[in-house]
UniProtKB/Swiss-Prot annotation:
Cited PANTHER family: AMINOALKYLPHOSPHONATE N-ACETYLTRANSFERASE-RELATED-RELATED, BLL8307 PROTEIN
GO molecular function terms listed in the Swiss-Prot or TrEMBL record: acyltransferase activity, transferring groups other than amino-acyl groups
EC number(s) from the headed UniProt entry: 2.3.1.-
Organism, as annotated: Bacillus subtilis (strain 168)
Cited InterPro entries: Acyl_CoA_acyltransferase, Bact_Acetyltransf, GNAT_dom
Keyword Acyltransferase: yes
Name of the protein this chain belongs to: Uncharacterized N-acetyltransferase YsnE
Length: 151
């Protein structure tokens, strides 16, 4: 698998990000959706990666700089044709390694509290993320859980 920084202009990547946003609208009430659209993902504080198997998009993920010591994982998504093949593990490992290179002391994330998000929570737990209070601009939300990992 090849993981590369992506400018979010390719058809497959745009489609996967839009699919991610649409799925969030099906699983979460509007006030609890924290997924970012293409324009926000192109912001200077965010690095977005796409993961490829040959010419087929396998998944994506992003790292948002909250401050010089703290990063946030955003937009983790696996293409439907690559589910349960270890794509998310590889993308997450790549993001963690990049956060360490940047000198971040902590990496945090927000994900859903509903059953449909259980695979994501289990993945993050397996990498040593622990549940925490809301961080950055997040507030308490019964549809969200917050996790963090010291680097």
């Amino acid at each position: 698998m090849h993981i590369k920084i992506d400018d979010l202009t390719g058809r497959q990547v745009v489609s996967l990000v839009n699919e991610h946003l649409h799925s969030m609208t099906l699983m979460s009430p509007p006030e609890s959706i924290h997924a970012l659209g293409l324009e926000k993902l192109r912001g200077p504080e965010i690095t977005f990666w796409s993961a490829w198997e040959g010419d087929e998009l396998a998944g994506c993920g992003a790292l948002k700089e909250l401050d010089t010591r703290h990063g946030e994982i955003k937009s983790m998504r696996t293409s439907a044709s690559h589910l349960r093949k270890g794509v998310a593990k590889q993308v997450l490992q790549h993001i963690i390694e990049e956060a360490e290179k940047r000198g971040y002391e902590r990496l945090s994330l927000e994900t859903g509290s509903m059953a449909s998000f259980e695979p994501a929570r289990k993945l993050y737990e397996s990498f040593g993320f622990q549940y925490c209070e809301p961080f950055a601009d997040y507030g308490e939300d019964p549809n969200s859980v917050f996790m963090t990992k010291k680097l």
